[in-house]
Regions:
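Glycine/GP-enriched mid-protein hinge/lid loop-to-helix segment characteristic of carbohydrate kinases
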Residues: 15-17, 31-33, 41-44, 48-53, ...
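Conserved phosphate-binding loops in N-terminal lobes of ATP-dependent enzymes
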Residues: 15-82
Length: 180
């Protein structure tokens, strides 16, 4: 935290951070990240420990709040990568590798609990963004990232832009019907 004096008025400048969440079929990893991309704190929670996404969000909030208080930082946003994460709808849609069934309004749940904007995308698309900004695809305009974990997915980048498709599900390969 920085403290500035401006005509007998103190202004407190608190470091701002984002929360990154990777929801997987086995574990949910999270990290508190500063503006430079440094991970200030991280952890994981077992996905199967939560009967509902609401239970998960409440437990995540308690865990992250402690870290934010210890670091004396201000959370300004949340980014989520999840199987069948739909960027357009803010939902996780019928993910075969999660025990939570149906359409889950994850962005709504996180925004309500944390009080900051949240965004979601498919976990493989999030991996493609990570590779484009920090990893092996840095400087590349066209590439595909294929992920294999509890599920199978891909993130497609064409001309430096992530491809979402008309419904937000472009690149989903793990639980889609395929013609061979």
């Amino acid at each position: 935290m920085q403290l500035f004096l401006l005509s007998n008025l103190y202004i407190i400048m608190q470091t701002t951070v984002s929360l990154g969440i990777d929801i997987g079929g086995t574990n949910i990893a999270f990290g508190i990240i500063d503006k430079s991309g440094n991970c200030l704190a991280n952890g994981s929670l077992p996905t199967t420990a939560y009967n509902t996404p609401q239970d998960f969000v409440q437990d995540l909030y308690k865990t992250v709040k402690k870290e934010l208080d210890n670091l004396d930082v201000q959370l300004v946003g949340i980014g989520v990568g999840a199987p069948n994460g739909n960027y357009f709808n803010g939902t996780i849609e019928n993910a075969a590798n999660l025990s939570w069934k149906g359409t889950i309004p994850m962005v709504e749940l996180l925004t309500k609990q944390f009080g900051v904007p949240a965004f979601i995308t498919n976990d493989a698309k999030a991996a493609a963004i990570g590779e484009m900004v920090y990893g092996g695809a840095k400087g590349m305009k066209d590439f595909v990232v294929i992920t294999l974990g509890t599920g199978l997915g891909s993130g497609i980048v064409i001309n430096g832009k992530l491809v979402y498709g008309h419904d937000g599900l472009a690149g989903e390969v793990g639980d889609r019907k395929s013609v061979v």
